[in-house]
């Protein structure tokens, strides 16, 4: 995605599987089931197909856990925020209601985009975020602003910031995994519980705590995420042998 190659991406997985199945690029040995390897680990997938269309994809994500509680960082011109940091395939700073932040609904998307990189930089400068079993996975990459849901049946709402200036239009698969891990660690979710997550535009993912797990000496969960994707087009890239830059170039 725009921020580079991540250890894991939930909405990207849902989209990729939908595209690959609908276009016949892969044929699973057992219809409706497959697994993929990601930098974060193996992800098991089920999908529901009606005719030639994939109507739902559910991924069983890597073990997810609460990394730290109550970390604080000062944002210049705004003030101090406290966050929990959880891992769901990427590290997320989760911003819940507090003195300077009541609900994401009080902020425009542009305001969240302005605050997020400052908060991320401050947290990365002050704290270390390293996966206990996969030390190559390190650094806080995403900010998850929370809020009350607006859609019927939703449990919670979020705005997930990533990259330089992007907010996820989906509820974010790894972000939903991280949020469920945070809530499970605090006794607010148990194995078998569902968690319906709403995005900034109102789209929904269906999360579920599938099992308990351990990551190093940390209690963790195995979350699953269900959602759908629709194809919107194809892009054709070709190489002109007359182009001296046909194979790319670097500036920085």
Task: Provide a role label for each language-model segment.
Residues 1-8, 13-252:
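Active-site proximal loop and beta-alpha junction motif in alpha/beta enzyme cores
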